[in-house]
């Protein structure tokens, strides 16, 4: 504020603070795919991006393809515009590209996917599945919304190519969403969209009508923090912390959960997905867990089509201590055993 107060406290361009857009473009470019700053729009968190994309693409009863299960926040944003959801099935490898059939994709406005450490399952798409997905979407002329809030939080396995980069090579339209919430702080409420300029131009109009521009002070502060490679030293610390937290939870589940309960093994991110025995109801289990001061999210709200399994739930391991993780999982395991 002392050095650039007149810029920081004045109205700014809707597209975002220029140096930050340039940083994002450079950060997301590779040796064979170059992103232009003109393809970057700064938004007030990727949640705003989801709402803006819903406003741009969805009319009442428009067909929208989503993973089953999918991110609840996206479903809430899109549902405001009353689409017709078509579920794309998932398995232990995440989204199944073959499910993006000609019948399902006909007339679809877009497909929404989280290829890295998906919320809620924690699963990651393989490079082969990513390639098949963008090729199918290119052939069907369906835009892909790649939501990637957790991509920087890998702590096991090998990094996979982004749908953005694969899509550029395959001729697919990919709209990439990123955020500073998961790598810096969620209270900053700042993210970005990378898309072809024709789409960015439309989104700029939508954003200008919504809030003129994202906070210039916040944009400049984030740029000052990251411009000199702060993330290169900060992210390894975050990854190591989340890795430990994840292992604490997985170890506790292996110790306390009974036979017949299954869960995912995330390579990064913040969540894992639990499947209880068929006869159990996660919503009913939640009420008993809350009485013991343990909380989780039942799986049903993550399904867009109303056909969710009632025996699934999401756990998060990133905001609690090892002691609390082990205590909570022990209680949850006891409650599951009592239900069985």
Region spans (language model):
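PLP-dependent enzyme catalytic core of the Aspartate aminotransferase-like
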Residues: 170, 291, 307-340
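Conserved core of the PLP fold type I
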Residues: 2-141, 145, 151-169, 242, ...
